[in-house]
Amino acid sequence: NTLNAKRCDVIIGTNTTYDALDTTKPYYRAGHVWIYREDSGYDISSWDSPDLKKAVIGLVDKSPVTQALSRNGLMANAKPYRIQRDLTKSPGEPVEDVVSGKIDVAIMWGPLGGYYAKQSDVDLVVVEIPEYAEGNSRLQGKTYWNISAGVRKREVERREMVEGAIFRNLDKIYAIMDEYGIPHTEPIFVDRLDGYKRHKK
């Protein structure tokens, strides 16, 4: 709405396949992460981790990872957060609760969780949930997306200008993301869970 009202001209950090926008080629790919205290002794690298089975797990209500929790018998461990529906809540509340000990593990959208974990005074571990590893197949649901910048439909010249600026400065962009704790991986161009291509390399 803000874009179409011409209150801004570019939206950064949007899903590459978002049809309401004309998006640039993706410049990174992001997914969900597990976050836990370093002093917890946890070692989580897959949905089969014994540590997940004994943990209180916080996640945003109706998050895409809910399907994975259900498939792995972890819903009884889950504590939902209604952050998206309550503007009085901090987006970093699950991380704050990991720090305070209210929950053991937070599952969050990587760019959001990584940022808040980086700000913490307590040492936290941020682990990217494997995208296509065993145990995170189609049955687990889609938890990763290519990320682009977007402009209004039919503004081809503006899109090309923004795209050029992004890719000329990609190393600087990645350095800033690293500084703020934002996990990122290389975009992929055939996503079997999307079922189609949006951009070619």
Please identify what each model-predicted range represents.
Residues 1-19, 87-88, 180:
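Extracytoplasmic small-molecule ligand-binding "clamshell" domains
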Residues 3-13, 54-56, 94, 98-108, ...:
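Alpha-to-beta junction loops
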Residues 4, 8, 39-40, 70-74, ...:
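Sec-exported extracytoplasmic/periplasmic mature domains
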Residues 10, 15-20, 40-42, 62-67, ...:
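Solvent-exposed loop/turn segments at secondary-structure junctions
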Residues 15-30, 115-153:
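Ligand-binding "clamshell"
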Residues 33-90, 111-112:
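Bilobed "Venus flytrap"/periplasmic-binding protein-like clamshell domains
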Residues 39-41, 47-65, 137-184:
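Extended ligand-binding regions for polar small-molecule ligands
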Residues 64-85, 160-201:
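Ligand-binding clefts/hinges and TM-proximal coupling segments of bilobed small-molecule sensing domains
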